[in-house]
Every structure is written in structure tokens, then in C-alpha cells.
Amino acid sequence: MQEPEVIKILQEELKFTDQSIDKLKMYEIELLRANKKYNFIAKSTEGSIWSRHFLDSAQLVKYINFRQGSLSDLGSGAGFPGLVLAIYNQNFNFHVKLYEKSPVKRDFLDATINKLKINAELYPNVFDGIIESLSL
């Protein structure tokens, strides 16, 4: 599935805004740039970022109540699904917490969060802050 088809699904079925799509495009640029050096995603999937990574991550919006609370992405890696969900939720009072132990991946995530100006917080260890964020 090509980018235009995925964008149509994201907008029509999952209600991504034009602004969210623009941020996904910026995320794609940053990811491809970083991937040349760090291999965050398999080279064989670079041509299918929109269908394999963005759409797969975005499908979770059907099951999340973005009106309240937060979501934790443990072992965020290149930001899937956490960054995609943070991009989607920019119009809601909802917080995405990304947990990543790799300094290289954290640097990428931090730079991307700041560049895209999205509501996400990055933790350097999967255990930092997670106990406080769990509601039982």
C-alpha cells in the first residue's frame, strides 16, 4: 500500500488531521535520515514506512480513550507505536510516555519529539516513573 492510500485511511477511518499527517511526514524524514546511520528499521521496510510502521501503529487509536490518562510505550525503539500515537493525540488531553534504554534511540526520540512539538515524555529506563504512572 502506497503513502497516498495510507493517508486516506488515516484521515477517513482513523480521523488523523492534516496537521497530524504533516507531522508524520516530518517524522518519516527524520527516521530515514537517522536510519542511514543507526539502522532503526530494516532497510527493506524503508519503502513501506507508511503502511508497515505508521498505519500499523495508528490502528491502536480505535482502542484508546484519548480523552483522559496516558499511555506507556515500553522499549520505544524508533518510536512505534508511541510517537505515532502522540502525533495523533495532539488535540487531546492525553500524554504518551516513551521508555527507551538505548542512548542512541533516546537521542533520536528526544530530537523528534522536540522538532515535531508533540505531547510525549521520554524516560531513560523502562522502570523510571512507570510505577507512579500505573493505576491499579
Q: What is each model feature region?
A:
Residues 58-136:
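Conserved SAM/SAH cofactor-binding pocket of Class I
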Residues 2-66, 104-105, 111-118:
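Class I SAM-dependent transferase core
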